[in-house]
């Protein structure tokens, strides 16, 4: 079983990318569980056809300790298994603690047991690794492979660089490695070349360039992944390609985060000022 966490700047398209990739893997016959690690609980919505799923924390609040595995997971597109950690009420408590509670409960209930015959577990993690709770999947070795969703925008690259610093911090203790960058295009000038150069500097690869296409939004409005909504569309093939590349990937590295000055220089060389 491969344990993969998807990180990236808030709003970069992590949840959309994760769900479409999971749809691609599930379509290939892989058994995949997705664990949403975001208080918004929107990491599985497209796989579930828009159904709002009761989160682990909400279930614990209402059911107490008397919780069974099927209370906190639902079956989505192509038999994918969907779990949402959830979070505290806004302004109260720590969302990072919610992730820790949720993953520990899943372990106790046997969600990762060999009898479940999982090929993949994906953690869709909120934002940056500034908070210990959100770093939990890599800190505790729950995830062994990290993919960072990035674009050619400056703040997305800053966030990716910071996430790499977090990976380095936990790499030796937790055994976590970076599998690559996924460029979720924003149609920035020289974007593909810039992210390829950024990946080289980090000592990793741009595993896939996902072009920007309105079909993604169209599918989301219809509460589906692109692969389910329009399986013959070229954008569906992009996500299938990403799924296959992750399946075949054997490049797992401890990244070499860039100094801020060097990152800004790369942006100037390849970016809008080029």
Curated annotation (Swiss-Prot):
Gene Ontology terms: biological process: nitrogen fixation
Cofactor annotation: [4Fe-4S] cluster
Catalysed reactions listed for this entry: N2 + 8 reduced [2Fe-2S]-[ferredoxin] + 16 ATP + 16 H2O = H2 + 8 oxidized [2Fe-2S]-[ferredoxin] + 2 NH4(+) + 16 ADP + 16 phosphate + 6 H(+)
UniProt keyword annotation of rRNA processing present: no
Keyword Amino-acid biosynthesis: no
Binding site residues for [4Fe-4S] cluster: 94, 131
UniProt PTM comment: The reversible ADP-ribosylation of Arg-97 inactivates the nitrogenase reductase and regulates nitrogenase activity.
Alphabetized UniProt keyword annotations: 4Fe-4S, ADP-ribosylation, ATP-binding, Iron, Iron-sulfur, Metal-binding, Nitrogen fixation, Nucleotide-binding, Oxidoreductase
Cofactor stoichiometry and binding remark: Binds 1 [4Fe-4S] cluster per dimer.
Gene Ontology molecular-function annotations: 4 iron, 4 sulfur cluster binding; ATP binding; metal ion binding; nitrogenase activity
Residues the record lists as binding ATP: 8-15
PANTHER family xref list: LIGHT-INDEPENDENT PROTOCHLOROPHYLLIDE REDUCTASE IRON-SULFUR ATP-BINDING PROTEIN
Physiological role: The key enzymatic reactions in nitrogen fixation are catalyzed by the nitrogenase complex, which has 2 components: the iron protein and the molybdenum-iron protein.
Family as reported in the entry's similarity comment: Belongs to the NifH/BchL/ChlL family.
Protein name, per record: Nitrogenase iron protein
The species this protein was found in: Syntrophobacter fumaroxidans (strain DSM 10017 / MPOB)
């Amino acid at each position: 079983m491969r344990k993969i966490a998807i990180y990236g700047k808030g709003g970069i398209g992590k949840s959309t990318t994760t769900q479409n990739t999971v749809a691609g893997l599930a379509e290939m016959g892989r058994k995949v569980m997705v664990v949403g690690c975001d208080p918004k609980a929107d990491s599985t919505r497209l796989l579930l056809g828009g159904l709002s799923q009761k989160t682990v924390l909400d279930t614990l609040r209402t059911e107490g300790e008397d919780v069974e595995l099927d209370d906190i997971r639902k079956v989505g597109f192509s038999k994918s298994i969907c779990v949402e950690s959830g979070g505290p009420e806004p302004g109260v408590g720590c969302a990072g603690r919610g992730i820790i509670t949720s993953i520990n409960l899943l372990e106790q209930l046997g969600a990762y047991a060999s009898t479940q015959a999982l090929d993949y577990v994906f953690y869709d993690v909120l934002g940056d690794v500034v908070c210990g709770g959100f770093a939990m999947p890599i800190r505790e070795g729950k995830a062994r492979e990290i993919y960072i969703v990035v674009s050619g925008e400056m703040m997305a690259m800053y966030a990716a660089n910071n996430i790499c610093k977090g990976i380095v911090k936990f790499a030796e203790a937790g055994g976590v490695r970076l599998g690559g960058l996924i460029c979720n295009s924003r149609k920035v000038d020289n974007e593909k070349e810039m992210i390829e150069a950024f990946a080289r500097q980090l000592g990793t690869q741009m595993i896939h360039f996902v072009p920007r296409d309105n079909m993604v939004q169209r599918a989301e409005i219809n509460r589906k992944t692109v692969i389910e909504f329009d399986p013959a569309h070229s954008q569906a093939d992009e996500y299938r390609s990403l799924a296959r590349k992750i399946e075949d990937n054997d490049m797992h590295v401890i990244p070499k985060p860039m100094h801020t000055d060097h990152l800004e220089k790369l942006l100037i060389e390849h970016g809008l000022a080029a």
